[in-house]
Amino acid sequence: VRWCRLLAAHGIAADPERLELGPPGIGVVAPERRNATILHPGAASPARRWPADRWVAVARSEAERGRPVLVTAGPGEEGLAAAVVRAAGVAGGSGGTVNPAGPTDLLHLAALVAAAERVVCGDTGVAHLATAFGTPSVVLFGPTSPDRWGPPPGRTIHRALWAGREGDPHGAEPDPGLLRIGVDVVVDALAALPARGATAGRRPEALR
């Protein structure tokens, strides 16, 4: 809002409710990476990181429903993403798979989010990418209220989960409020998201 006010003061129209971005145009998104459920287990501080075993449970739940799952990582989070993938494995006979997204810079990560069917993440930049590209999302908040950094209110394609208590966003352990969010709550929130085809939002055509 402050940036919009600054622009308005110089005669430049800016609507704080319009947060959409066009998709990044950087190559082709491989077919097997489109329409996936993206899980992004990392976050800047331990206080905002949901436990890895819960990410594993969500990955398995999605795979059991026949959905492809991509586990993404930011710099320094590759080990966490790999551990989630190894523990989740492949749901036999369901057609669902759990795979690492592989090395991704910011533009590649943005393209994957723009091409995804849905996103699950913590209070991180990936949540803002999902908002910008109109990708349905479930965002897990711990020490910080979604009123500060969450998706815009009133948009049914985004679900912000929060236990209702604030804490230390820089804490060295997962926030107690974040730990109150159970796997079943996240799975139910995913099930309640509208299909991507029913929402507005452009997808990138390319990324390899």
Residue ranges and their predicted role:
Residues 1-208:
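Catalytic machinery of carbohydrate-active enzymes
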